[in-house]
Amino acid sequence: MSSVIHFCRREEDFYNIGEIAIAYSIRDMLRSRLKPFTYTPGEIKELENPQPTEFVETINQHDICVIGGGGLYSKFFLPMNAQIIKSIEIPIVLYGIGYLRNLGDNELTQEQIESIRLLNVRAKLTSVRDEYTCKFLRNLGISDVHVIGDPAIFLDSEETSQVVLDDSKIKIGINVACHYWALYPKYLYPIIDEYTKACEFLINHLNAEIVYLAHHPDEHHVVEIMRKKKLPLKVADTSPNPYKMKFIYGKMDLVIGMMMHSTVLAFGSGTPIVNVAYDAKNYNFMEFIGQKDKVIDVRNADQENIKEVSLRTFDDSKNIKRDFRALKRELWTRQEEFLTKISKLSTN
């Protein structure tokens, strides 16, 4: 039997559908390879501060320690406690981790960078979700890096009738990042207004219906504001079930999202995407999937460029979907190769 302890974002953000999608997808893929299999969830923040001896002893009772995915290479999770990392005796696997830095925020400190270096030196296997993060690690002297894509790309879907869609209309999913980010105080309300105006145009121009794809509880504030502006929209909120949200993403004809995992779930569902970026990770992932020209910096976003990029993306839907299918097949091959490497660790 293979026993895995998996540290990722859980306690604070487990109501964030993207974080749930990451955790469940990694768990499910490991379960399919490591049979029989036991799984112990851990909170990533437990690795940041000194812990009693029993904490590390519990980790070392397992066969493998998985850390990730998500944007763990960021100021929010670093530095990790060096003594804990050095005391982990079982193989460490870094799974699909990404670099995260809000637009307008500071670079990582040297202490945080050294923590990343230590973590990767101690790891038996390192994987990242995009090419930028791979380049970042290689610049730190970490050479053996597997680029596998975000784990949540491969999340299964579960049918749901939570949102009843009109088959006669073009279905556009939208998402606004309403948790705190560096430029949030200045740009949140302007971007809600610009989104609303762009959606009004798309409703009339494309005969579209708008579906708000809620990733975080705070986003219901966005829905409330948009409805006060008389924007007709349906709301999908499947938390804490990410499988159902993935199903709804697959029903969309276009997604205009801000949250990182709005982009990930759309790509995983084969749905064309426009991204309004508030973080470097948005650019990095969209470039990784060949869609960098579909990114709008939140500082420059207005109804006109949201409309322009949305129409351009929608008009090219056939080619985008074809390219997404091909890239997803390639990434699944990489994912399987990485899972095979993990399975060999459990038998050594």
Question: Whereabouts are the PLM-identified features?
Answer:
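Active-site anion-handling motifs in enzyme catalytic cores
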Residues: 1-348
